[in-house]
Amino acid sequence: MVDYKLEKRSYVIGGVAIVIVIVYIIRLFTLQIMSEDYKKNADSNAFLKQIEFPSRGAIYDRNGKLMVYNQPSYDLMVVMKEQEGRLDTLDFCNSLGITKEAFEKRMEDIKDRSKNPGYSRYTQQLFMTQLSDKDFSVFQEKMFRFPGFYVQKRSVREYTYPYAAHVLGDVGEVSESDIEEDDYYQPGDYIGKLGIEKHYEKELRGVKGVKILLRDARGRIQGSYQNGKLDQRPVAGKDLTLGIDVNLQALGERLLQGKIGSIVAIDPRDGSVLAMVSSPSYDPRKLVGKNRGKMHRWLSQNPWKPLLNRSIMGQYPPGSTFKTSQALTYLTEGIITPGTAFPCNHGFSYKGLHVGCHGHPSPIALVDAISTSCNGYFCWGLYYMLGSKSKYGSVQKAMTVWKDYMVSMGFGYKLGIDLPGEKRGLIPNAQFYDKAYKGSWNGLTVISISIGQGEVNLTPLQIANLGATIANRGYYYVPHVVRKVQGEPLDTLYTRRHYTKASKRAYNYVVAGMRSSALRGTCKMLSRYDFEACGKTGTAQNRGHDHSVFMGFAPMNNPKIDIAVYVENGGWGADYGVPIGGVMMEQYLKGKLSPASESQAAQMQARRIAYGSSSR
């Protein structure tokens, strides 16, 4: 007779056994297949995956002079699982010259996932960066006594010259946000922080390699796994060639010593930046090594803001350099002809409004107005343009046309230079004034914008680009610091011509005015050079002392260099702007300074401006 109770019990026992087996299978599958910790642990028992860092790309000036290169460095890495309970902490600390408290603090920070998001007990973690040669030699001899610790070879940046800090930038350790944004990086990695080191990070950094090492049961390295068949060699970063002429850059930094301001020089033939000086500056060689963080904090807290690249971040009234853009607009729109003459009896005076000007013959026509930097002429031009209802219908529509010309010349928006932090400046529009004056305004209300004052603000780069556009008689290339990336064509952003709305005929008259200025006008100091220079001064009004501004290019035909100089509180454009611009152009065109120019450069270097406040 069948015992159904026994049979039923057998089914239950069998079912329980099957469930237990299934649970074990699932757990084993989870451990071996799904568990990341298990995989890392299993790997670490037999293998050591050692990251090999690529050589970061070198940086050269336009003449092939090495500006930035690499030096070998050594980081100390730790695998927590391997050192637990096996490390003689006192011996370890003595070998590195650190305290036990510092050791314990560092180990806690490594384990803190809020500070080290990529932490794992089974993979290498950064313990100490940039061991000195002495510490490396000592540690290498004793490394067998410190299980779980390894030396990782890499490189650090070295800067050949004390120049071009704002252009080159620097390299520092990655932040948490850097790691979150790009999984290429791990804690302790380096990344470009400023300048072209930041903008061209992906080109410069290269690709990491991996070396898989085989270990025995005690964790001792036995050699490469499968003779290195699975290793991945690092790929070096790409070298960059700049448009910068390091000798021209050095001269510019020398000339701006003791002054706040900027110099930007551009080759108008291709838009490459020949020099970019921002003063005050700093020595890029001091932002390397273990003291980088301390030095960077000091610079960032300095009230004179030496980290600020005024060439692309400073937004200033352009003063009379802006008159060239007005001449181009009035001529092309038919508001004036080259022979149109306006009165200027020490300024523009109409309906109780007066804008002052220095003494010169009156009435005056276009070329002489540019040469002598007449305020009245350009005020009259804007007044007639914005007041021409028969042509535009309203002041708002006329203002929109005016702004379209300004935008086509590269104002009011970022030009797109290959450096981080560029500012756009300010070009007002009709909506701006409608809001400010509740729709009740006219050409007299905004007359100061015609002479580069009022609401108009440009960066020194935009002023230089205006000069390059005039040098080219109507077009510009987006200014760029890098001329060549190793193995890659230059981005088409930097090789396309950008034409303005102004006519070529208008540009020819503006060039004539700038040449006249260099011969007999406000830039006549340039007449001593044996190359045909063209220039335009600016004296930008300011709440304190006026700013000294200059924009020019040379030679007049087939120009090779365009330059903008901006010296805060420097007074007349001829006081600082013209002499600085002149010697810079001579240095680039001739390759050296004449004795007379060297004497002038020495005098300019020695001149200091007493700034009344340390807050800039």
Question: Which residue ranges define each predicted feature?
Answer:
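Periplasmic/cell-envelope proteins involved in peptidoglycan metabolism and beta-lactam response
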Residues: 1-293, 315, 398-408, 450, ...
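Beta-lactam-recognizing serine transpeptidase/beta-lactamase-like catalytic domain environment
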Residues: 68, 216-221, 225-229, 269-321, ...
